Design a protein with these regions (language model features):
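Short amphipathic alpha-helix that is part of the acyltransferase structural core
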Residues: 2-55, 61-63, 67-69, 98, ...
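Active-site/acyl-donor-binding loops of N-acyltransferases
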Residues: 2-12, 138-179, 240-379
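A short helix-loop-beta-strand connector motif used in the catalytic cores of GNAT acetyltransferases and
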Residues: 54-72, 78, 131, 218-231, ...
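Conserved beta-strand in the GNAT
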Residues: 67-69, 75-85, 98, 237-248
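Long, hydrophobic/aromatic-enriched structural stretches that serve as scaffold segments
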Residues: 79-85, 96-112, 117
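Conserved acetyl-CoA-binding loop-helix of GNAT-fold acetyltransferases
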Residues: 104, 109-125, 302-315
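Contiguous mid-protein beta-loop-alpha structural module that forms a pocket-lining wall or clamp
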Residues: 108, 116-230
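Non-catalytic interaction/regulatory modules that flank or connect domains
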Residues: 200-204, 213-247, 251, 315-322
């Protein structure tokens, strides 16, 4: 009996030294430092950085971004955020929050008291204007985080598993384009149709973004321009579309290390990739030269058109010295099967959860049977 009591008292005293706040511009240098110095471990360890300004993508019309920081004895030790925007739920636009960017200083490994108090602080902030749903993703091989978050501990929100998600990194080299079927936005002069067509398409999926013209204009400051779109038109309407969104000007993935066996095999893997057109393993210290597929419009049953569209985006990416195209699908999405068959891609698996607190956030059981389709570029 004394053991649990002592543990609670030690946790209480330790946690009392931690202060939580909503982050502002003054916190920018320390947040970026925390992201740089605390890579995500795995077979390929990477740092997800936000240079030169963590807040560069804040202020997009229709989005509410809130970042929480934790300080222990004045030192920033943890950061996490939530982006609330319009996403489709059961065919209708709803206010949906995505919880992401959680990073705890590795020197404080095991300090789950900080995470518990951070989630409680976030819950208190959300009571004034909560989203209708919240969701998040956790890497499938991050067993430690999954074990903690799925346990339903006191003071923690409920994590309800809703599906597996697969992010693809498709190498762009050695592709032949499919023109003249494809054209870019400036040629087609789509205007509002570039918003209405993706929205009509996305209504068939869960958590897919609901776009607006205002945010599309704002994205030009973040590297998404009219020339980045490629489209297919039939009978005066858009039947397929996609955009190449290079976010490296404000969001980077840096290769920090490889598992020993993978480091040893890297030269052979890259030599084979050069011959086969498969994905190469970048050198340690390099920024991954990737861009995201955004504003994807493609019917599930149009398998040939999907492959042609992604091929055309690969050609566009290669011309810009982008080495990988990144996009993601739920594991039960037929489009994933098509791309696995047509492209040699590297896969990263994660698990999607609906997150909720008592009285805040909708439950997973309220979702109908539509396929999950959050856009990787917004996660």
């Amino acid at each position: 009996m004394a053991g649990p009591v002592l543990e609670r008292e030690l946790t209480k005293r330790t946690a009392s030294r931690v202060r939580f706040d909503v982050a502002g511009e003054a916190d920018d240098p320390e947040i970026r430092c925390l992201l740089r110095e605390n890579p995500m471990a795995g077979r390929i360890s990477v740092s997800l950085t936000r240079e030169p300004n963590f807040f560069a993508d804040h202020g997009v019309p229709g989005e509410t971004k809130q970042t929480i920081v934790a300080r222990e004895n004045g030192r920033l030790v943890c950061v996490g955020g939530c982006t609330i925007r319009q996403r489709f739920v059961n065919g209708e636009p709803r206010r949906v929050g995505y919880l992401g960017g959680l990073r705890l200083d590795t020197r404080l490994g095991g300090r789950f008291d900080i995470l518990r108090r951070g989630y409680e602080f976030f819950r208190e902030l959300q009571t004034a204007a909560p989203a209708e749903f919240y969701f998040t993703s956790i890497a499938s091989d991050n067993e430690r985080a999954r074990a903690f978050l799925e346990r339903g501990l006191p003071g923690m929100p409920s994590y309800e598993f809703v599906g597996e998600f697969v992010a693809l990194l498709i190498p762009t080299a050695r592709r032949k384009g499919a023109k003249p079927r494809f054209g870019d936005l400036s040629e087609a002069n789509l205007g509002k149709e570039l918003v209405t067509s993706p929205n009509q398409h996305n209504a068939s999926f869960q958590f897919a973004p609901c776009w607006s013209l205002d945010e599309l204009a704002a994205f030009q400051q973040l590297g998404l321009n009219p020339a980045d779109f490629t489209i297919v038109r039939a009978h005066g309407k858009v039947t397929a579309a996609g955009a190449l969104w290079d976010q490296r000007s404000f969001k980077q993935t840096i290769i920090e290390d490889y598992a020993p066996w993978l480091r040893l095999l890297r030269p052979a893997i890259n030599a084979f990739a050069t011959v086969s057109g498969g994905p190469r393993l970048p050198a340690v210290g390099n920024t991954l030269a990737n861009a995201y597929v955004s504003h994807l419009v493609i019917p599930i049953d149009e398998t040939d058109e999907l492959a042609e569209l992604i091929t055309e985006l690969c050609v566009m990416a290669a011309r810009r010295r982008v080495e990988f195209l990144t996009l993601g699908f739920a594991s039960d999405d037929p489009r994933l099967t098509v791309l696995r068959r047509r492209f040699r891609a590297r896969e990263y698996r994660s698990r999607l959860y609906v997150v909720r607190w008592p009285g805040i956030g909708g439950p997973a059981q309220d979702l109908d049977g539509r396929i999950l389709a959050p856009e990787v570029a917004l996660l």
